[in-house]
Amino acid sequence: MLAGYQADSLLWPTSQGDGVVVAVIDSGVMKDHQDLAGQVLPGADFTGEGSDGTVDKDGHGTGMASLIAGHGHGDKAGIMGLAPRAKILPVRVSWTPADTVAQSGLAKGIRFAVDRGAKVVNMSIGGYSGTDQETRQAVKYAVDHDVVLVASSGNSGQQAASVEYPAAFPGVVAVGAVDRQGRPWEKSTFGPETTLVAPGVEINRASAKSSAGYGVANGTSDSTAYVSATAALIRAKYPNLSAGQVVNRMIKSATPPTDGSPVPSDRYGYGVLAPAKALEANPSVDNGPRENPLSGRRESQGAPPGDDPTDGVSEETVAPGADGGGAGGNGMGVVAGAVAGGAVLVIGVVVALVARARRRRRGVAGQGYGQPPYGGPYQ
């Protein structure tokens, strides 16, 4: 196993995401989940149901929010996000991307997030059309307003032509998934737009099945949440940096692949997300260009909306609660990583697992912070 380090000693004393609003454009976020209580702001609902975004009938958005800003509960139980003091702005959109209402909802959701002060926008969704000008202009609006946009590459693996939209839009950080060993997850969609990869296998997260619900999943959705959380950590610690400089920090600090593959590449992008390195002093980036380095990125043929809107959706194994046995130790978050060329390869923060199972299997809830082992529509 890769060498580990304590998140509470390397990440959280430096930054916890204080003062940063992260918009989660997804299925909504359950504001009453015990690990998110007090973290979720009133948002918006673009599905036509008239909520404020704090309704989540699927559970996916709640899971993403927990990986970003979960604070656990009780005696070190539940899910801790990488940025536990960031605030979540829920933006509920339809999860049927072939629907024109859904396409329009994404565009409106992005603009809403920007206008409500989000500094980071997490889009763990995919399968949208790259030809939709309303969404394209909304992405540009966010980039022009100094917002970090992060989206999942897709969960179709080699079956997809390339990275899905909205991740493939210029200016968006497109995120793929790696497993515990830092190897590409077999279903992670890849292409020239891939920017970074992050942990996305056997990820424990909150679920909206109940206020004490949890689940386990594989997917680029989870990887995307970790990148968004890291962006929040950077924005909290370095508030004067532009969104482009935040993106550049994550790119420049990424760890090379464990298999020695050259980067940038279609599978790894610029490498594996390394939050601790991204928070270190980096004058060459901080004093460099403020423009988004991805704004001029070439677009290959994006993956079209699938006939089955559930394609690419991470299948969550749901656990009923988090009241089972602990994982030993003090239960605080441990980040599993490896030192490569002086850089820490962050594979994630694991504390006691809420459940441990491969995707597509059922799990049982456990106790202790469930920060996963590395950390579209719904991916």
Residue ranges and their predicted role:
Residues 12-22, 29-42, 52-102, 190-193, ...:
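Subtilisin-like serine protease catalytic core
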Residues 18-21, 85-87, 115-121, 144-149, ...:
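Loop/turn elements at helix/coil->beta-strand transitions in domains of secreted/extracellular proteins
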Residues 27-31, 46-48, 72-74, 94-98, ...:
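Solvent-exposed loop/turn segments at secondary-structure junctions
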Residues 65-68, 201-268:
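Hydrolase catalytic cores
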Residues 93-165, 212-218, 222:
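Substrate-binding/access-modulating region of protease and related hydrolase catalytic domains
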Residues 152-171, 176-193, 205-218, 259-268:
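Active-site-adjacent substrate-recognition loops and nearby beta-strands
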Residues 186, 240-335, 372-377:
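C-terminal subdomain of the subtilisin-like protease fold in secreted/lumenal serine endopeptidases
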Residues 317-379:
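Hydrophobic single-pass membrane-targeting/anchoring helices
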